[in-house]
């Protein structure tokens, strides 16, 4: 990838990150179940997992961290925003790094490992903000939120991967484009190597009786 191509690719990522961050924020705010630690359960995991599957660890990490953190700020939970950015962002990074193949077992295992980190991270954050008792009581709820998000994300990613492959080519699980060599380039290559089109495409004569 040339420097110019790389710069164009990076510039094209900005609108994508902005759109996906906005979608993640909205979905996180759409369903909110208040918890004893003055936080709330939500559907952010679905977009965190999807972003990591589709766009890889680093872009997914930015989306996964910013979207839920903005939801905290807009929903009246500013004390959680910094914790959310770090915990959810690292969750997406872990998923993007661990999950390498589009296979249910691989995706579930990697996502569960990242989900365990999230449950642990929110337990620590909840203990700091509201005490260890209430934080311990939310472990089951956070685990359930992770499981629901994983199911939604897997179904959504599988559908998008099939319907519109270019959207998910940046991640490890995307459908990679097929590389074809234009005829003009192939002809030029043959000329450089001294091979004519006829020679390149001709099949050698098979002597009579030489077949198997």
Where on the chain are the PLM-derived regions?
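Loop-helix junctions at membrane interfaces
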Residues: 1-212
